[in-house]
Amino acid sequence: QSVVFLRCEMTAGTMAVAEVAELVHKCFPNPTVLLVEAGGCACISVALTRRSQAEQGATVVDRVESTGAFDPGRSEYADFLGALAFGRLSQGDLWEYLVDLSRTVALSRAIGGLGFYPVCPARDREKLIALTSRYDEMGASVKRLKEQRRSKDITLNESAKLRMEMKEEERRLRAVADEIKEICNGRSR
């Protein structure tokens, strides 16, 4: 099986690059890697495909990992961009390369919250990937709680409950961030 690599250009100011990338991935039966440029921002998106279990001969997008829009000139993205170098990714076969590329992209989503690209010893990589996934989920949960709290038709009591729930989720988010930092500094538990 082959992999499709595409470079796409979008108009400056377009912020839904990850969503557009997901739509483009569905157009191809092969695994795809997209480099999307929108003005000064970039997005790297990797789609892994598999054979459909329901429809014989068909392929479906199994998983999509996307960076979202980022400024490649910002210093905190330097390590991530370096990690994308061909020689630094797994070279066993094309599938291993693609899975490693996908994991590298998944780890990049933590840059915004942590302020750095998480790198760790190989023995801790799976744990780091699981923690960054949890970090993503908790960050989305905090964002969702903030949006609910800003709702115009929410009572004062409901707002207070949401605030307490949000503070607890933020505490958990900080704990996961601390655990990620420990792994990256070589002091994993």
Map each language-model feature to its residues.
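Residue-identity detector for glutamine
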Residues: 1, 53-56, 91, 148
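N-terminal, leucine/charged-rich tether regions that mediate assembly and partner docking
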Residues: 1-52
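Serine/threonine-rich low-complexity intrinsically disordered regions
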Residues: 11-17, 90, 121-124, 176
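Generic structural signal of hydrophobic/aromatic residues within well-ordered alpha-helices
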Residues: 20-24, 98-101, 105, 176, ...
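Catalytic nucleotidyl-transfer cores of nucleotide-processing enzymes
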Residues: 43-64, 68
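Negatively charged, Asp/Glu-rich surface segments that serve as flexible interaction/assembly modules
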Residues: 61-152
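Alpha-helical oligomerization segments
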Residues: 122-189
